[in-house]
Swiss-Prot record:
It comes from Rattus norvegicus. Binds to type I and type II collagen, fibronectin and TGF-beta. Forms a ternary complex with MFAP2 and ELN. Interacts with DPT. Residues 17-30 form a propeptide. InterPro entries: Leu-rich_rpt, Leu-rich_rpt_typical-subtyp, LRR_dom_sf, LRRNT, SLRP, SLRP_I_decor/aspor/byglycan. This is Decorin. GO terms for cellular component: collagen type VI trimer; extracellular space. It is found in: Secreted, Extracellular space, Extracellular matrix; Secreted. Glycans are attached at S34, N206, N241, N257, N298.
Length: 354
């Protein structure tokens, strides 16, 4: 009888199929046979895991499930909620009730066009909110004051209101690229309410000038792929903490005299793929600029003192990368002493004009 039982069990094992991964967390679990956590009436937190979602270590993953609305209940100790790549169209009030410990909310690549003003009210610890690739026409009202990172690129946003950002003093990163924004739709000083903001990206929009009234705390400003035609000194006034300025792929023809003096701590200047006719004034006097990208412009002449001071005194910080290739100027037309303050031959990229 025992022999028969053993043979039966062996047969059951031999009929079992190979391991098949069902979810992201399968290889993280030690006690479960799959990433699907079973219903457990004795553990209310596990039992609250939404159907077809995966819950583990305070992380709830409900991505790529074809959901058309937010599931009605989550474990209350959830810290990260992933709802990306679904078909959610609206975030209603109460959608995230009781999620007082939530730190990260991912709603990328849905069809969200409407968010209730009270939708995020329960999220008193939310730090990161990702709403990119949706159909939002305006920013949600009453954002949590605890937010540190907000990403809203590739939506349909046309206006930035000052009232939306007031009081968001913990915000560090904001991404607004890929929206049909125009300068007329950006309220003057709209972003000034974020006193600790360090990084802004407003790329691939319809803006024609650097937005006015940006927070003075910014260290990185990315405005690539817009329709900016000119950099004037006033637009950079007060930006004393700016270390990286990205203005590639615009239509800039001139950088006004005195502009670089307003950004005394600038280290990287990206002005490639524009319509510049000359090297921006003020580079030689700037103490900290290390990287200057000027390739793919219309620069036909490089002056002997455009990059270095007239004397042979060394700069406080040396250039590490200067690109001038794909400009009308020929390398043999540039005076041999033009880059006298640069150390390292590989630092300068001249190339040929095509």
């Amino acid at each position: 009888m025992k022999a028969t039982l053993v043979l039966f069990l062996l047969a059951q094992v031999s009929w079992a199929g190979p391991f098949e991964q069902r979810g992201l967390f399968d290889f993280m679990l030690e006690d479960e046979a799959s990433g699907i956590i079973p219903y457990d009436p004795d553990n209310p937190l596990i039992s609250m895991c939404p159907y077809r979602c995966q819950c583990h270590l305070r992380v709830v993953q409900c991505s790529d499930l074809g959901l058309d609305k937010v599931p009605w209940e989550f474990p209350p100790d959830t810290t990260l909620l992933d709802l990306q790549n679904n078909k959610i169209t609206e975030i209603k009030e109460g959608a995230f009730k009781n999620l007082k410990d939530l730190h990260t909310l991912i709603l990328v690549n849905n069809k969200i066009s409407k968010i209730s003003p009270e939708a995020f009210k329960p999220l008193v610890k939310l730090e990161r909110l990702y709403l990119s690739k949706n159909h939002l026409k305006e920013l949600p009202e009453k954002l949590p004051k605890t937010l540190q990172e907000l990403r809203l690129h590739d939506n349909e946003i046309t206006k930035l209101k000052k009232s939306v950002f007031n009081g968001l003093n913990r915000m560090i990163v904001i991404e607004l690229g890929g929206n049909p924004l125009k300068n007329s739709g950006i309220e003057n000083g709209a972003l000034q309410g974020m006193k600790g903001l360090g990084y802004i990206r407003i790329s691939d929009t319809n803006i024609t000038a650097i937005p006015q009234g940006l927070p003075t705390s910014i260290s990185e400003l990315h405005l690539d792929g817009n329709k900016i035609a000119k950099v004037d000194a006033a637009s950079l006034k007060g930006m004393s903490n700016l270390s990286k300025l990205g203005l590639s792929f615009n239509s800039i023809t001139v950088v006004e005299n005195g502009s670089l003096a307003n950004v005394p701590h600038l280290r990287e200047l990206h002005l490639d793929n524009n319509k510049l006719l000359r090297v921006p004034a003020g580079l030689a006097q700037h103490k900290y600029v290390q990287v200057v990208y000027l390739h793919n412009n219309n620069i036909s002449e490089v002056g002997q003192h455009d990059f270095c001071l007239p004397s042979y005194q060394t700069r406080k910080t040396s250039y590490t990368a200067v690109s001038l290739y794909s400009n009308p100027v020929r390398y043999w037309q540039i005076h041999p002493h033009t880059f006298r303050c640069v150390f390292g031959r590989s630092t300068i990229q001249l190339g040929n004009y095509k």
